[in-house]
């Protein structure tokens, strides 16, 4: 489904007592992280992440390197059956990786040039949480693209494709930082 369709029992899934109503997905896709049954959730951080999922809010989690910020998001997503993709910004990721690029592909056994969408257009059109990892290490040209997406009603325009992708609210997608 394109929208969360299953009420989640926060006490059962996260061992958290709260009146917050959160929905996840009934079915699991290949993009849903595996559940670590030994994972222990921090209540305040978990509630912030859950609010991001439920109310289409961007969430930033800060802390020292290696303290499990991204893993925390992935474990929340796993229990919601919510697709989640981690994008490491300290690697060689480019604007083209995020937005898309022309590529040579085979169609009817012939090579043709075709625009292949990047991770951002794909994530806007599908219910997926993006985890921008190592945010402080992102290159300026990459961060400029991400900044537009992180705005409350973010807009992504693909000029080469004459396409404008808009967030709608409430949205089946969440961008989690």
Where are these regions (language model features)?
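N-terminal low-complexity segments that are often proline-rich with Ser/Thr-Pro
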Residues: 175-177
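AAA+ P-loop NTPase catalytic core and its hallmark functional loops
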Residues: 1-169, 173
